Amino acid sequence: MDTCVFPLVVLWISMRITSTLDEVPIGGIFDSRSVQALTAFRHEIHMFNRAYSHVYRYKLKNDTTILDVTDSFAVSNALCHHLSRGDLAIFGVSNASSLATIQSYTDTFNVPFVTISMAQNNSHNGSYQIYMRPMYINALVDVIVHYRWEKVAFYYDSDEGLVRLQQLFQATNKYDKMIISIDTKRITSVENGYHMLKELHLMDPEMEHRVLLDVRTDKAEQIILKVMNDSKINNAKFHFLLGDLGMLEINTTHFKIGGVNITGFQLVDPFNSTSELFISTWSSLDPVYWPGAGTNHVNYEAALAADSVRLFKSAFGSILQKDPNFLRRSRSGTAGKSMKCTDDSEIKTGHGQMILEEMKKVKFEGVTGHVAFNEQGHRKDFTLGVYNVAMTRGTAKIGYWNEREGKLHAHNPRLFQNNSSDMNRTRIVTTIIKEPYVMVNNVIRDGKPLVGNEPVEGFCIDLTKAVAEKVGFDFVIQFVKDGSYGSVLSNGTWDGIVGELIRHEADMAIAPFTITADRSRVIDFTKPFMSLGISIMIKRPQPAGKHFFSFMEPLSSEIWMCIVFAYIGVSVVLFLVSRFSPNEWHLSEAHHSYIANDFSISNSLWFSLGAFMQQGCDISPRSMSGRIVGSVWWFFTLIIISSYTANLAAFLTVERMLTPIDSAEDLARQTEIQYGTIMSGSTKAFFKNSQFQTYQRMWAYMTSAQPSVFVKTHEEGIQRVRQSNGKYAYLTESSTIDYVSNRKPCDTLKVGSNLNSDGFGIGTPVGSDLRDKLNFSVLELRENGDLAKWEKIWFDRGECPQHSSNKEGAQSALTLANVAGIFYILIGGLVVAVLSAAFEFLYKSRMDSRKSRMSFGSALRTKARLSFKGHIDSEQKTTGNGTRRRSHNSVTYTYTGPTNVMGGSHAFEDSNTHTEV
C-alpha cells in the first residue's frame, strides 16, 4: 500500500509546484511560410517549460499569430492582440514593409520585438527591436573584392533585396582603388530568373558572369539547377554568390558534375557542439506534432528562432536575479494593465526598457554561434563560414568572415582555380617521418631539399609507389613543414598535414594518418589501408625476481601456515586417540611382560610427516579412530601434493611480469604514473571529444598536469617512456606500439586492449580528381593481399625474445635459481642431522660415564671406537644392571626393563612404548 501512495504524493507535490509557477506571457508573429522557424520557436519554449521552469521559478506562456507578413494591416491587428495580452516581448518575422509598422507599435508601447528577419539601417538607440539575423553586407563585399570581381550582376526578388542593394552600394564606396559595377534586375519567379540568366549568357557566351543571387536558398538552388540543365548554357562561365545565409541547405551533389561554381555563407556551423545538439534533437522530433522537424536539415531561420527564445530566457533570468519581485511588481503597476491600440491614453509598459537593455547585454553560444548585440540591437562578434562548390569538388569550407575583425580569412585564395591541363602533373605527396611507415637514410636526414624518392623507405612509401603505378602519376615526397598531423587552431584554420591539403600545398597525404570525423569535414579520405586503435605504451617491467624459495610459490603463505598447523593438529589428535583406544595397546615383542603403544607423540609426528611426504612408515594405526585420522590425513595430503605438483612446473619454468596497469581505467584511477599523447593529432582529439567518463577524466588530468604530459613528436613520447623508469605511459596507435616493443632495446610494452577502433587512410583535398582512383587502388591492394604482405615485411621484424605479460608467461628452462632453496634445505637438514648426532653422541657418552663410574674422556673414546669400528676389541666391564655377552667379534648389551606386573595401578607407568631405550 505504501509503495502506491508514495508516487501519488510525489505527483501531487510536483503538480502543486507546477501550478504555482509564475507565467510570463510572450507573443509570436510568424509568416505562414516560416514553418521551421515557428516549430523551433514553439519547441524551444516547450523544452524550457519542461526542463528549466522549476529552476527559474517561472514558465513561458506564448500566443502565436500566423499570417502573411507582407500584409501590414494583419500585422497591426496581431500587434494589438499581443499588446492587449500584456506580452512582455514579441518574437517573429518581418519584411521591409511591415517592419516600419512593427517599429511604430513597439516603440510607442515600449515592448521589445525580437525578429529573425533582416536588419534595417534606420535603427537607432531608442528602437525596441532586437535583430537575431546579422548584417553581413560587408562580408558580401569582401568576397567580391577577394575574387576581384569588377562587374557583378545583382538579382533580387523582394523589397529586402532593394535594401541590401542600397547597403551594397554604400559598402563598396570604401574601396576607392577598385571600381565595382553592379547591374541589378528583379526576378519574379524561378522560371523568370532562369530566363534572365540565359539571356545574360547568350548575349556574350565567352564572357564570365559573376552573379549575386539575393533570393532564398531554396529558390536559388532551383534557378541554378535550371541553368545547369540547359545544354545551351556553358555552366563554367557562371560563378554564383548566394546572398542568403544557408549555403549548406542546398543539395550540392547536383552541382559537382555540372561545372557551376557556387560560393555562399553559412550562419549555422554544423560542427559546433551547440548546433550539433540542436540538430540531433530536431531530427528526433515527430513531424506530425512538430511540422518541419524530424530531419537533419535545419534552415538558419529555425536556428535564429531557437536562439531568440534562449536570448529572452537568459535576459529574464538575469532580471529575476537582480529583482526577485519583478513579476509581482509588473502585475501590480501600470505594466499590469491591458494596453489597447485604440486607447487615447498613452499606457506604456514599465518593464520594456529593462528587458530590452538586459537582452542587449546577454552573451552566449547559441545554435547560430556567438550571440551578442550592440546598442542598436544588431548582432556583433559573429562569424560566417564561407563555402564553395565547384566542378569535381564537393562542398568545401574555404574560409570565414568575422564581424569583429571585419575581414575575410581565406584558407586558399587559389582554391577555385580548376585547370584541366594540369591533371597529369607530378603530384606532391605529403607525409611525416615515423617508423616503420616512413623512414629516411642518414644521407638526407639533415638535408632540407629532397632529391628524388629513393632515400625514403617504409610501409607508406611502398603504398605510395603501388597506388602511383595503378593510378598512373609521378610523385615527389614532401615532409610536412610543421611536423604535425593536423588540428584546428583557435582561428578556425588547420595546421599540419590537414592544413597543407586544405591549402592545396600537397595533392595527397600518405602517412600514418588517422581518419577522423573532424578531418573528414575539411578533406577527403580513401578507405582505410590499415586498421588499428589507440593503446597504452609503458616501460617493460622487470620480471618478478627469483628467490631461493621459489618452490614455495605454488601455494600462498597462508596455505603453508595452515598445512603446518594441520600437521601438528593431526599428530596431536592421532596421539590422543591412540592413547584412549584399547586396540592400540599391545604386548611388547621384546618383553612380553610389558604392554606398549606405538604412537607416542614423536611417532605420531613421524607418521604424519611420512604421510605428507608420500613416504611409508613402520607403524600404522590399528584402531578405527586412528585409521580414520590417518585416512583423512592421507586424503588431505593427496589433494595438497597434487595441487602443488600441478602448479610447481608453471611457477618454476614460466617467467612472469607484473605490470602496474592493465587498462585505461587503471590509468585514470591513479596519479603516480603520468600519461599523455602527442601534441597534435587524432589521439589527442579522441580524448578531447570523448563522451566516455573514463576518457573525460583522463583528458582533464592531461590538460592540467604539470609539467605537460604532451609530447611534440612520436620519438619524444617513446624516449619519455624509456627514461621515466615506469612513471610515464604514452598513448598512441597500437600498431606503432607493437613495432617499437619488438625492436631493440626491447624495453617497452603494450598493455590492455585498444581504446577505440581507427584506421589510416590516404587524405586528399576535397573534390580531388584522384580521390576515387586512390580509393579503388587501396581496395584492390587489400583484396590482393599486398597490404598484408607489406605489413608483415615492415612490422614483423622482431628483434626481441618472447616476453611474458602479466597474464601469460613465456616458458623457459629450469635454472639453479629456481630450485636453489631445495638444495639449501637439503644442506641445512644434513647439517642439523650431523649436529644432532654429535649432541646425542656427547650426551650418551656423558650418561654412560656416570653410570660406569669412568671418566668422560674414556667413555667418549669407547663410544668413538664403537662408532668407527662397529665393535669393541677388548673386554669391557659392565656396571649397573647390564650383563655382558662376549662373542668373537662383538659385544652385545642387554638391558632389562622395570619388573612391574600387569594388574596394578602403576602397570603402565614408564612403559608406553618399546622405543624408550
UniProtKB/Swiss-Prot annotation:
Which residues are glycosylated according to the annotation? N62, N95, N121, N125, N229, N251, N261, N272, N418, N419, N424, N491, N775
- Stretches in topological domain Cytoplasmic: 578-631, 840-917
Any transmembrane segments, and where? 557-577, 632-652, 819-839
Give the GO cellular component terms, alphabetically. postsynaptic membrane
| Keywords carried by this UniProt record | Cell membrane, Glycoprotein, Ion channel, Ion transport, Ligand-gated ion channel, Membrane, Postsynaptic cell membrane, Receptor, Signal, Synapse, Transmembrane, Transmembrane helix, Transport
As one GO molecular function, the record gives:
ligand-gated monoatomic ion channel activity
Per UniProt, what is one Pfam family of this protein? Answer: Lig_chan-Glu_bd
- Keyword Transport: yes or no? yes
Q: Outline the segment boundaries, as ranges, of region: Disordered.
A: 871-896
Q: According to the UniProt topology, which residue ranges lie Extracellular?
A: 20-556, 653-818
Main subcellular location: membrane
Show which residues constitute the signal peptide: 1-19
Which SMART domains does its entry note? Answer: Lig_chan-Glu_bd (SM00918), PBPe (SM00079)
Q: Where in the cell is it found?
A: Cell membrane; Postsynaptic cell membrane
What's the stated role of this polypeptide?
Receptor for glutamate. L-glutamate acts as an excitatory neurotransmitter at many synapses in the central nervous system. The postsynaptic actions of Glu are mediated by a variety of receptors.
Q: Under which name does UniProt file this protein?
A: Glutamate receptor
Q: Which organism is it from?
A: Lymnaea stagnalis
